[in-house]
């Protein structure tokens, strides 16, 4: 990812204003999309921990978790209430992952939405042996979150941290993907909260970017996202292959691409 991409500003005010309406339409599209979603790859009881976005709670991830449960996964919310940021939640994350590992009897997959994805990615990077797979949804993993449209709200919760956060994201290795953990970043160019340029994963042999047509709020109720998440959770880490969208969903979801923009793995 280039320095220019990291320095982009927040999405347009129009995209932000349309978020609720677009998310409602995405939720309404789940029913007509159900025949396609019924073909999504099934799990075999794998444990999946789902982390919500900023100021959201487990209630926001219920639709996605119910769908994944219906496809044979064993999902769990994080049980920490509202996600009010790293200052309050950060110290609790390691214990959260440890409890999930205890329930599963081994490593688990992580799915994180927005800020939850940043937290999940940090867990995967710090504790790679405890994480099987990582999927982020519209998460600012490729640049400073001060460039998102919700930073003003975040600044009220944790005031005066802009300079500190920007400096931290300029540190060498801060944006590096987890080592040895397959990582899929799902993003939308029409995200009204997080600039799409910083919602993409860094280049690596186990990283990919999957583009969907979605609002930020709608990422948790979008048929294309549901299918892609189920597919990525079903993909074996060895050998790991990048995502290919089913024909009937190619209007709302793109093929997975290597994080450096290269083509999808032709062997799949």
Model-predicted segments: where are they?
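Flexible, membrane-associating and regulatory peripheral segments of lipid-active enzymes
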Residues: 1-48, 61, 66, 71, ...
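Generic secondary-structure transition motif, activating predominantly at the C-termini of alpha-helices
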Residues: 22-35, 97, 101, 154-161, ...
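Phosphate-binding glycine-rich loops and adjacent basic patches that engage nucleotide phosphates
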Residues: 22-31, 51-60, 184-196
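A general boundary/transition motif marking the beginning of the first structured unit of a protein
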Residues: 5, 9-12, 174, 217, ...
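Short, flexible segments with low predicted structural confidence
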Residues: 39-40, 89-90, 200-201
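C-terminal catalytic-base region of ester-bond hydrolases, centering on the histidine
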Residues: 179-268
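Serine-dependent carboxylesterase/thioesterase catalytic core
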Residues: 46-59, 63, 69-180, 186, ...
């Amino acid at each position: 990812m280039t320095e220019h991409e990291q320095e982009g500003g927040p999405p347009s005010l129009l995209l932000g204003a349309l978020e609720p309406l677009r998310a409602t339409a995405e939720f309404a599209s789940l029913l007509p999309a159900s025949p396609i979603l019924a073909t999504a790859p099934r799990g075999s009881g794998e444990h999946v921990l789902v982390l919500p976005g900023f100021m959201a709670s487990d209630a926001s991830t219920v639709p996605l978790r119910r769908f994944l449960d219906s496809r044979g996964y064993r999902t769990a919310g994080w049980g920490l209430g509202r996600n009010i940021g790293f200052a309050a939640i950060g110290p609790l994350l390691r214990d959260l992952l440890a409890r999930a590992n205890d329930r599963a009897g081994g490593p688990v997959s992580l799915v994180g939405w927005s800020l939850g994805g940043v937290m999940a990615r940090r867990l995967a990077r710090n504790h790679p042996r405890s994480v099987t797979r990582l999927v982020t949804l519209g998460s600012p993993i490729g640049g400073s979150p001060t460039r998102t449209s919700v930073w003003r709200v975040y600044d009220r919760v944790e005031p005066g941290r802009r300079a500190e956060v920007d400096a931290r994201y300029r540190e060498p290795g801060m944006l590096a993907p987890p080592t040895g953990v397959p990582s899929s970043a799902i993003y939308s160019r029409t995200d009204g909260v997080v600039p799409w340029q910083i919602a993409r994963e860094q280049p690596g042999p186990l990283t990919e970017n999957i583009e969907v047509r979605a609002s930020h709020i709608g990422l948790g109720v979008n048929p294309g996202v549901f299918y892609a998440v189920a597919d990525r959770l079903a993909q074996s880490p060895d050998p790991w292959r990048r995502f290919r969208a089913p024909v009937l969903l190619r209007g709302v979801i793109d093929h997975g691409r290597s994080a450096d923009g290269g083509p999808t793995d032709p062997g799949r």
